[in-house]
Amino acid sequence: MNQILSLAGTPAASPLGYYSWAFGQAARDPFYIMVVIYIFFPYFSAVVVGDPVRGQSLIGYINASVGFVLAATILFLGAIADTVGRRKPWILVTYGTIAIGGFLLWWVKPGSEGLSLYSSVGLIFIIMVAFAYAEVFHNAMLPSITPAERAGEVSGLAYALGNFGAVSMMVFVLFAFALPGVQDWPFLPEQPLLGIDHSLNEHDRI
């Protein structure tokens, strides 16, 4: 029986292994779409900071700081990802940091009710660094687990699943939390699920 080799020339993982890798991106990408692009960052800028210009400036400083940290450490991380055999513990740590940080975003509120502004900035910074590190270790797994002839298929599947997961999550949040109580459409619940209160911007923080 011929052994199937990966792009790295090592024995490829089973289909369960490389398809699980693809679904890993489906779990990660919705966070970026929901938090960074469409919902939380605009909420942070306009509501928490209270000044969209200053808010965007703070987000710019966060992104610049994350970029500096990555520039200083990414080569070392890449070397670790390429030379250390076990990458899953690193993925567990980075994904766990993202999950815990995402949970704590619930307490990012305007005024003095939740985390302070600079605590919120620090939390977002940590999450964004963890997200970037998660990408490094996740992407580094592809050459060693995927059969060489299926690398494009698996990579494309991961990209598609990531986008599908992000769009699905966006639609769910819209129809479960954001639109009920605002739009009088017959197929919507009368009130947001889980008792979400729009006046407290809970639909932006959930």
PLM features: what roles do these ranges have?
Residues 155-177:
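Glycine-rich segments within core transmembrane alpha-helices of 12-TM secondary carriers
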Residues 52-55, 87, 175-206:
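A membrane-interface helix-boundary motif in multi-pass transporters
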Residues 123, 129-160:
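Cytoplasmic helix-loop-helix junction between adjacent transmembrane helices
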Residues 81-97:
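Cytoplasmic membrane-interface "Motif A"-like loop-to-helix N-cap segments
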Residues 59-79, 100, 170:
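Central cavity-lining transmembrane alpha-helices of secondary-active solute carriers
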Residues 71, 92-114:
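C-terminal ends and interior cores of transmembrane alpha-helices
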Residues 7-71:
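Helix-loop boundary and gating motifs at the non-cytosolic
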